[in-house]
A protein has these predicted regions:
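Serine endopeptidase catalytic core focused on the charge-relay Asp
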Residues: 91-257, 273-275, 284
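Short, small/polar residue-rich loop motifs at catalytic or cofactor-binding pockets
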Residues: 264-268
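Noncatalytic regulatory segments and standalone regulatory/sensor domains
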Residues: 1-115, 123
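Surface-exposed flexible segments
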Residues: 57-70, 193-206, 296-299
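C-terminal subregion of chymotrypsin/trypsin-like serine protease catalytic domains
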Residues: 253-254, 261-262, 273-316
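Generic alpha-helical propensity signal that fires on short helical segments
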Residues: 65-67, 141-143, 200, 233, ...
Length: 316
């Protein structure tokens, strides 16, 4: 049994009670010196001193450390050190394919593409129902935020779109898509074709009708991943959702290239492209087992079917 490509689960921490402390202590650690061991030669080492504040570079403290270590020091100014957050999990403007996005009550999924109604000028963002519409629970007009709430996105300041339409997920019978669109906020900048190191989106590709084809995607969790098609027209695929086990027909199966998985939780909604950077599918589910590399399999819906059902075209 397969599960939807889960949006990241939110872990809740209990409130901490603390006794009165100096404000300085409550504000956290101060940037001074980081100390470690650096190599001097093949068999010799010295003290590594990393200065984290500009005004401390020529201070008496550095001179004192130098003296205490008898000159066996490697002093370098490194400045402020910040957490490393991938661009696709950060707040990004203009909006791009592959960014973290979600309904304000969902954790985080992926912005798949920019689309437009055939008779309208408004631009819509495309992703999964379970990313933008909270598995049928959302209402038209609900806020969509970038980044998703799990990545610190907040309703209001990070709202970028309003839910426009979703294809209902059915508990009985067959599902053929997990898809939704949200209307982009007016005057919000976006780049509908940027695929980072892959180049530029080159429209919509031909329907996948054979195995072995090379594909790629940019997703909220794993970023750029390469893969290959291992099956198509997959029927009776049972996918686990919060609302139950749902059946999907006529889907595409993909495995990761080399030793990596093609997708992980949070990559839901990713646009999958072929080796000519043409859109071919919309990612929606995956599992941890299977594949020739043992890293799991990913499932996606042919993009033509998604666009047809939602009555939209890709923005190029």
């Amino acid at each position: 049994m397969w599960s939807k490509q889960e949006c990241i689960p939110v872990s809740l921490s209990s409130k901490l009670r603390t006794s009165p402390q100096p404000i300085e202590e409550l504000e956290g650690s101060h940037r001074t010196f980081a100390l470690g061991i650096a190599q001097k030669s093949e068999r010799d080492y010295r003290l590594a001193v990393r200065v984290q504040r500009h005004e401390l570079r020529d201070s008496s403290e550095v001179a004192r450390i130098h003296e205490m270590a008898r000159g066996e020091v490697d002093v370098r100014y490194v400045g402020r050190i910040v957490k490393q957050v991938p661009w696709y999990q950060s707040r990004e403007r203009p909006l791009k394919i592959g960014l973290s996005i979600a309904h304000y009550l969902v954790t985080a999924g992926t912005l798949g593409a920019f689309v437009r109604r055939k008779s309208a000028e408004s631009v819509l963002v495309l992703s999964n129902n379970h990313v933008l519409a909270n598995e049928n629970k959302a209402k038209k007009g609900d806020a969509v935020v970038q980044p998703g709430p799990f990545d610190k996105g907040k309703k209001g300041k990070d709202s970028v779109a309003r839910l426009e339409e979703f294809v209902p997920l059915k508990s009985t019978g067959s599902n053929v898509v997990d898809a939704a669109v949200a209307r982009l906020t007016d005057k919000l900048d976006y780049d509908p074709r940027d695929l980072q190191s892959l180049g530029r989106l080159a429209g919509v590709g031909e329907e996948i009708t054979s195995i072995g084809g090379a594909v790629a995607k940019i997703g909220r969790t794993t970023g750029l991943r390469l893969g290959r098609v291992t099956a198509f027209e997959v029927d009776n695929l049972v996918v686990t959702y919060g609302i139950g086990n749902l059946r999907f027909d006529n889907q595409i199966e993909i495995e990761g290239a080399d030793t990596l998985s093609f997708s992980e939780g949070g990559d839901s909604g990713s646009l999958i492209v072929d080796d000519a950077q043409r859109a071919v599918a919309l990612l929606f589910a995956g599992g941890d087992h299977g594949g020739s590399n043992g890293r799991g399999l990913t499932y996606a819906t042919p993009i033509d079917r998604v666009l047809t059902i939602l009555k939209v075209n890709m923005v190029s």
